[in-house]
């Protein structure tokens, strides 16, 4: 169960980061519609990662090895990725 949660969490983290990065690229290109769509997917991936973050904590009862803790911690930084993408989208909208 724990291994499954870790794999799913890693997938959602990667998806959130990838879609947020691609949203930033589309914003810089002036393709607002695509940037919004990509940012929406990134936000959904973050929500899934948040749920898995909580599941992992409950399943492990706070006993995580170093590798698991790194992944656990990385999921807590996804807000920054989304904020960067939102900022770039707002800049693109003002052009």
Located regions from the model:
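Long, low-complexity or tandemly repetitive, helically biased scaffold regions used
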Residues: 2-95
């Amino acid at each position: 169960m724990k291994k499954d949660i870790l794999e799913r969490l890693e997938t959602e983290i990667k998806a959130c980061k990838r879609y947020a990065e691609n949203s930033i690229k589309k914003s810089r290109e002036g393709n607002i519609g695509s940037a919004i769509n990509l940012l929406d997917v990134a936000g959904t991936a973050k929500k899934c990662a948040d749920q898995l973050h909580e599941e992992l904590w409950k399943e492990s009862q706070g006993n995580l090895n170093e590798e698991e803790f790194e992944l656990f911690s990385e999921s807590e930084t996804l807000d920054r990725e989304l904020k960067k993408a939102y900022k770039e989208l707002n800049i693109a909208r003002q052009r």
